[in-house]
Amino acid sequence: MAQILLAEDDKATRDLVKRALESDGHTVTVTQDGSEALEQVKEGGLKFDLLVSDVEMPMVDGVALAERAFPLQPGIRVLLMSGFAEQLDRAKELSGPHVAVISKPFTLDQVRESVRKLLA
């Protein structure tokens, strides 16, 4: 299964998404904000298949994180999540076959389906 980097500042959301992805057989590395996630990407110890990130986070937001992750880990896929319309619009600017955007609140089935499509 996939190596997934999860960047989410809300603990409840982070824990739910992590458990769902792990129950599907993925290995999940968890970070609490964009700068912590960026450090994981930069370290290069793990090659991540997928970045799952909130858009609105302290320090480095999810869109900036994705933009920085692409050259550091070529081939990485990105799932961006947000509850704010203007942030969703910004996230959709990264659109392509390697990026998906879902709005909060979401169901775990929506997360799983988005992950499945991105990794296919």
Feature locations, PLM:
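Active-site residues of response regulator receiver
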Residues: 54, 82
